[in-house]
UniProtKB/Swiss-Prot annotation:
Organism of provenance: Mus musculus (Mouse)
GO BP annotations, alphabetical order: COPII vesicle coating; endoplasmic reticulum to Golgi vesicle-mediated transport; vesicle coating; vesicle tethering
Tissue-specificity statement: Widely expressed. Expressed in lung, heart, liver, spleen, brain and kidney.
GO cellular component, one term: endoplasmic reticulum
Coiled coil: none
Subunit structure: Homodimer. Component of the multisubunit transport protein particle (TRAPP) complex, which includes at least TRAPPC2, TRAPPC2L, TRAPPC3, TRAPPC3L, TRAPPC4, TRAPPC5, TRAPPC8, TRAPPC9, TRAPPC10, TRAPPC11 and TRAPPC12. Heterodimer with TRAPPC6A. The heterodimer TRAPPC3-TRAPPC6A interacts with TRAPPC2L. Heterodimer with TRAPPC6b. The heterodimer TRAPPC6B-TRAPPC3 interacts with TRAPPC1 likely providing a core for TRAPP complex formation.
Chief place of localization: Golgi
Lipidation positions, renumbered (S-palmitoyl cysteine): 68
Family: Belongs to the TRAPP small subunits family. BET3 subfamily.
The keyword Lipoprotein appears for this protein: yes
Encoding gene (name): Trappc3
InterPro entries attached to this UniProt entry: Bet3, NO_sig/Golgi_transp_ligand-bd, TRAPP_component
Keywords assigned by UniProt, alphabetized: Endoplasmic reticulum, ER-Golgi transport, Golgi apparatus, Lipoprotein, Palmitate, Transport
Localization annotation: Golgi apparatus, cis-Golgi network; Endoplasmic reticulum
Taxonomic path: Eukaryota, Metazoa, Chordata, Craniata, Vertebrata
Protein's name in the database: Trafficking protein particle complex subunit 3
């Protein structure tokens, strides 16, 4: 019995490592394809956005989470359910703005950066920028326009990885004329 449980853990670890290495290969290829880090950062954000737009359906189906009533509830669902479900981590939520429209997600351990060291000639690269795009894309599909950006990164010598989230506005559904 314990042997099977051990296989499941090993399989999950191998799957996680394969994902990390595959993501690293993707970023490496983007660095070769684009001339500067800013273009790579934009491409990672765009790719993440497209993933988020599709991932939200899977998330809603698998998590049985209902509609969030405010940005604080949304932050809790992102940190405690979504990150746990897809990356196996639970970031902490800190640094709320007084207005309640901004917060930080603190990742003590970012699984995307395992085995990674940024070369000196890529100091402007935001290696995990895909995550910001995923957050923007997924939240847009549930009628929330947000800004997501990295403000700290362990790859750049910071103690933790921090993603700053800012609520911009609620997106209204605009139905085509004649459809309601």
């Amino acid at each position: 019995m314990s042997r099977q449980a051990n296989r499941g853990t090993e399989s999950k670890k191998m799957s996680s490592e394969l994902f990390t290495l595959t993501y690293g290969a993707l970023v490496t290829q983007l660095c070769k394809d684009y001339e500067n880090d800013e273009d790579v950062n934009k491409q990672l954000d765009r790719m993440g956005y497209n993933i988020g737009v599709r991932l939200i359906e899977d998330f809603l189906a698998r998590s049985n989470v209902g509609r969030c009533h405010d940005f604080r509830e949304t932050a809790d669902v992102i940190a405690k359910v979504a990150f746990k479900m897809y990356l196996g981590i639970t970031p902490s939520i800190t640094n709320w703005s007084p207005a309640g429209d901004e917060f930080s997600l603190i990742l003590e351990n970012n699984p995307l950066v395992d085995f990674v060291e940024l070369p000196d000639n890529h100091s402007a690269l935001i290696y995990s920028n895909l995550l910001c795009g995923v957050l923007r894309g997924a939240l847009e599909m549930v009628q929330m326009a947000v800004e997501a950006k990295f403000v700290q990164d362990t790859l750049k010598g910071d103690g933790v990885t921090e993603i700053r989230m800012r609520f911009i506005r609620r997106i209204e559904d605009n139905l085509p004329a004649g459809e309601e």
